[in-house]
Swiss-Prot record:
It comes from the Bacteria. Disulfide bonds: none annotated. Pfam families: RemA-like. This is Putative regulatory protein FMG_0656. PANTHER family: REGULATORY PROTEIN SSL2874-RELATED, REGULATORY PROTEIN TM_1690-RELATED.
Length: 83
């Protein structure tokens, strides 16, 4: 299992990530609201501002306080270690 650090010592399986997006757009806000209603929302911001939304292949939506660019760099670094 390849894991991605998403802040505050929390990890997700990087092989199951579909998208890492910014939370500001209305479609993403609707996805987050739907996940909350369906009990599929995982909030690991620890009260800080949500800066990225991670959509998983298991229909879970993960909120992180890290920028999408930061998560992308961590994911790229993790993928380069495999090579």
């Amino acid at each position: 299992m390849e894991s991605l650090g998403i802040g505050f010592s929390n990890l997700v399986n990087s092989n199951r990530i579909i998208a890492i997006v910014s939370p500001e757009t209305n479609p993403i806000k609707r996805i987050v609201q739907k996940a909350k209603e369906d009990n599929n929302l995982i909030d690991v911001t620890f009260g800080r501002k949500t800066r990225s939304v991670i959509i998983m292949d298991s229909s879970h939506v993960v909120l992180s306080c890290l920028q999408p660019e930061t998560l992308q760099m961590r994911l790229d670094k993790s993928n380069n270690k495999e090579d």
